[in-house]
């Protein structure tokens, strides 16, 4: 991380659907506006595909150059949503089922709706802290 008196950040958008144009990025403007409002300078925004090596390599580059890196995309229930496991790999953290997240999701879905794809959303890297707000 470069030494600076100002706090800076990068935004890393992950998803083939963004790159193909099938989905429009709606997160960057909101996130950058909020970060700037609290004094964090957004230095860079990158859009990359759902490829583990690309995610790991890009994340490692950005975290060396910025105080913070915010990722969006790739955390849903589909097979190509590999952001969490890629973040785990970049930081050398274990990737496993988060018991508390699993319980929350299981309680949220109706019986029979908490399928394998949705259960995947409870798998993440160790040291994960769940948000305490009821809006997430």
What are these model-predicted stretches?
Residues 47-50, 100, 119:
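Short beta->alpha linker loops
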Residues 85-108, 113-117:
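Glycine/small-residue-rich loop that forms an oxyanion/phosphate-binding "nest" at active or ligand-binding sites
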Residues 127, 132-136:
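Single conserved hydrophobic/aromatic residue that forms the stacking wall/gate
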Residues 112-128:
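Short, glycine-/small-residue-rich phosphate/pyrophosphate-handling segment
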Residues 1-4:
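Basic/polar N-terminal segments that are highly enriched at the extreme N-terminus
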Residues 29-89:
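N-terminal small/polar loop signature for handling phosphorylated ligands or for N-terminal nucleophile
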Residues 6-38, 44-45:
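Glycine-rich phosphate/diphosphate-binding loop of Rossmann-like nucleotide-binding domains
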């Amino acid at each position: 991380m470069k030494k600076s008196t100002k706090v800076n950040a990068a935004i890393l958008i992950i998803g083939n659907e963004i790159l193909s144009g099938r989905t429009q990025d709606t997160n960057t403007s909101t996130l950058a506006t909020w970060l700037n409002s609290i004094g964090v300078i957004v230095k860079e925004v990158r859009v990359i595909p759902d490829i583990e090596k690309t995610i790991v390599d890009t994340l490692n580059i950005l975290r060396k150059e910025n105080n913070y890196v915010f990722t969006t995309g790739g955390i849903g229930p589909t097979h190509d949503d590999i952001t969490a496991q890629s973040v785990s790999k970049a930081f050398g953290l274990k990737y496993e089922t988060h018991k508390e997240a699993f319980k929350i999701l299981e309680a949220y879905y109706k019986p029979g709706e908490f399928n394998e794809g949705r259960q995947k959303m409870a798998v993440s890297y160790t040291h994960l802290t769940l948000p305490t707000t009821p809006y997430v």
